[in-house]
Swiss-Prot record:
GO terms for molecular function: acetylcholine receptor inhibitor activity; ion channel regulator activity; toxin activity. Its main location: secreted. Keywords: Acetylcholine receptor inhibiting toxin, Disulfide bond, Ion channel impairing toxin, Neurotoxin, Postsynaptic neurotoxin, Secreted, Toxin. This is Short neurotoxin 1. Expressed by the venom gland.
Amino acid sequence: LECHNQQSSQAPTTKTCSGETNCYKKWWSDHRGTIIERGCGCPKVKPGVKLNCCRTDRCNN
C-alpha cells in the first residue's frame, strides 16, 4: 500500500506501508489554521479531530 505522508499543504510525498491495509488523513484547526496530517494505518483520534481512513494507494491526499 502506498500512502501520502506530507503535512498540511506541503508538496505531495508518499511512502510505502508494508503490512498496512489503510492510509489516513486527519485534520484539525488551531491558531495556525487547519493542520493536516497523513500517513499509514488508521489511528485513534481525540475528540475534535476529523479522520478519514481509506484502503487504496494514495487515497489520502
